[in-house]
Amino acid sequence: MNKSFLLIQKLSKSFRDGNEKITVLKNINFSFEDIKIVSLTGPSGSGKSTLLHLLALLDNPDSGKIIFNNKDLVKSEDEEKTDLRKNDIAIVYQNNNLISDLSAIENIALANLNKNKDKKKSYLLAEKLLKEFGLENRMNHYPYQMSGGEQQRVAIARAIINDPKLLFADEPTGNLDRKNTDIILNYLFKLKKNNRLIIIATHNRDLAKKTDLRLTLSNGNVINKS
């Protein structure tokens, strides 16, 4: 695989708190020579979520490059970034962000409808994913009718319906008990495949130990790779 599949160069990000400038990420550099499942660890406030948001093109860095398939995404136009989020990039949040008045199958299919506009195909894909995630009996359930673990499985299914090459997960098990955490981790690791990179921000040490690469952040810097 091309070594520049995903390459991060001198990525920095800061925020304003009144008159104070708070630097969250400082000249982050790393690359992926193989498709991996990667964990981002570190204390709260170390920059994990900020880094994922930058990589998912949900925010812009102050400086630096995000090179994907030999192209610097930071310089991409907004329309191109939107297309990338539809086709190649997906993110799963701790709070799942499901649409409350849509059923499980509708939440998942909507992500694909935004891409191909073929309603029948989108719903067939969503149904297939629900079965793969053990949710065939929850297809027409709304988020409030499902457990936290079930909601998170729906969120992951929604994220992968367009077969993204980059999948980011921001504390995907942070609100779950041990049983549901194990279920979600099992599904995330099943998503490892050729031409897909999965990066998971987590405080879960057991999860981090199972990933191919562990990056530890502290005070906006990568302080350890293992």
Annotate each predicted stretch with a short phrase.
Residues 41-43:
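The feature captures the beta-strand-to-loop junction immediately N-terminal to the Walker
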Residues 64-72:
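Conserved ABC transporter NBD signature motif
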Residues 73-90, 193:
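ABC ATPase NBD coupling module
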Residues 102-111:
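Short coil-to-helix segment of the ABC ATPase nucleotide-binding domain corresponding to the Q-loop/switch region
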Residues 142-152:
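Conserved ABC ATPase signature
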Residues 161-165:
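A short, proline-enriched helix->beta-strand linker immediately N-terminal to the Walker B motif
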Residues 167-170:
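Catalytic Walker B motif of ABC-type/P-loop ATPase nucleotide-binding domains
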